[in-house]
């Protein structure tokens, strides 16, 4: 038998015995004799013989649902839910709610437990209905609103998520404005996909109102300016990322290059790339700088620049970029480069270009998710760096 189950069930068994003995105890003063129901001993026997399911069924029968046993029944229902037996948990909680003699607090707690049963079972419509009812009860409002936010996130009903989270702000001591900003950003993304730029801008403005330092909203605002041809405003907007979180500058570097070229501002582009690479580094900024040099001055100059840069900044992504570029140079003159095995080795061992890692749960992938697929945390993923690799290989 699972030791955890034994620890959880023993208190229930003790409580059952106490309650049963209390109900069977003679009412005459001084009469010390009492008899426990045989069902109680039967339940203990099932428990000791590692048959917890049968034991639980017996204890349910022993414990009549009234004002004195509600807490024990709620505990029993929770045990079922933790174990994944949602039908049994639901049945117990529905049975409690059906009793006419519950106090208001007991009724609300039973509703909350039943709502959690539905939520875990994926019966989201039923869960939503109960959580909405509980959100109007001061004793359960905060917990119910948190579940509603999760539910609406899961269903991608962002308007409802915003409404629930705004209500939650009244109860929560934690700053949840960044999460509220992310919901507005989700709506902005939908409008961007539909090319509804005015609506997208309105959602981005709302995101920045609740979270002025939102990197995601700043990226989106730059994207709007870029798509409508306001290239200088796009550049100015994206460059604010340098002050917010420069790790994400690589997410917009390609469009920044295009914007400078559309403005025919080659000098501005060279200055920006040089300063950004010196200040922040990173594989995407290095790649953009090398490609720009190769575009303006040719491959030889790009190789010379990259060789010098790797010498001064010995990083894995720099070495990999240099080997790739040298291999391209050799392949242009010979059928097969002697650097190909090294290139293959570096890629197989340290292929982190375009990879992101969640700082909360460690989830890793090649797509930037503003909400981590693993832990569901918002704004937890960031580009993988050489420092991550060194720690991993050590």
Where are these regions (language model features)?
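Start-of-helix register in tetratricopeptide repeats
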Residues: 37, 71, 105-109, 143, ...
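Long, contiguous interaction/recruitment modules in multidomain scaffold/adaptor proteins
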Residues: 1-34, 129-146, 150, 154-173, ...
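Short coil turns that delineate tetratricopeptide repeat
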Residues: 67, 101, 105, 139, ...
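Residue at a conserved register position within TPR or TPR-like alpha-solenoid repeats
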Residues: 46, 80, 118, 152, ...
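Structural register within alpha-helical repeat arrays
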Residues: 42, 76, 114, 148, ...
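Alpha-helical segment of the N-proximal tetratricopeptide repeat
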Residues: 32-68, 75, 81-85, 91, ...
């Amino acid at each position: 038998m699972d030791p955890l189950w034994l620890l959880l069930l023993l208190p229930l068994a003790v409580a059952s015995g106490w309650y049963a003995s209390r109900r069977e105890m003679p009412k005459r003063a001084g009469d010390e004799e009492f008899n426990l129901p045989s069902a109680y001993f039967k339940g203990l026997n099932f428990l000791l013989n590692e048959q917890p399911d049968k034991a639980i069924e017996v204890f349910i029968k022993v414990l009549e649902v009234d004002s004195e046993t509600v807490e024990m029944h709620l505990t029993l229902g929770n045990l079922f839910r933790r174990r994944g037996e949602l039908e049994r948990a639901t049945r117990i909680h529905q049975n409690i709610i059906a009793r006419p003699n519950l106090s208001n607090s007991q009724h609300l707690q039973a509703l909350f437990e039943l709502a959690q049963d539905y939520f875990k079972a994926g019966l989201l419509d039923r869960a939503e209905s109960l959580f909405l009812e509980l959100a109007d009860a001061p004793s359960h409002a905060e917990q119910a609103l948190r579940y509603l936010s999760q539910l609406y996130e899961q269903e991608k009903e962002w308007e409802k998520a915003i409404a629930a989270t705004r209500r939650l702000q009244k109860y929560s001591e934690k700053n949840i404005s960044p999460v509220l900003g992310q919901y507005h950003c989700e709506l902005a993304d939908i409008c961007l996909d539909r090319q509804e730029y005015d609506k997208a801008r309105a959602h981005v403005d709302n995101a920045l109102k609740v979270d002025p330092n939102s990197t995601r909203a700043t990226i989106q605002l730059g994207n709007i300016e870029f798509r409508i041809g306001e290239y200088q405003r796009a550049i100015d907007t994206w460059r604010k990322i340098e002050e917010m979180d420069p790790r994400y500058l690589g997410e917009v570097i390609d469009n920044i290059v295009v914007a400078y070229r559309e403005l025919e501002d080659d000098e501005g582009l060279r200055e920006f790339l040089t300063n950004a690479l010196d200040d922040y580094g990173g594989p995407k900024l290095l790649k953009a700088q090398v490609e720009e040099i190769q575009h303006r001055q040719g491959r030889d100059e790009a190789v010379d620049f990259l060789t010098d840069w790797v010498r001064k900044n010995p990083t894995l992504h720099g070495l990999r970029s240099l080997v790739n570029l040298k291999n391209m140079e050799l392949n242009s003159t010979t059928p097969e480069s002697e650097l190909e095995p090294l290139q293959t080795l570096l890629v197989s061992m340290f292929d982190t270009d375009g990879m992101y890692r969640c700082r909360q749960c460690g989830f890793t992938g090649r797509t930037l998710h503003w909400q981590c697929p693993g832990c569901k945390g918002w704004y937890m993923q960031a580009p993988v760096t050489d420092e991550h690799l060194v720690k991993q290989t050590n």
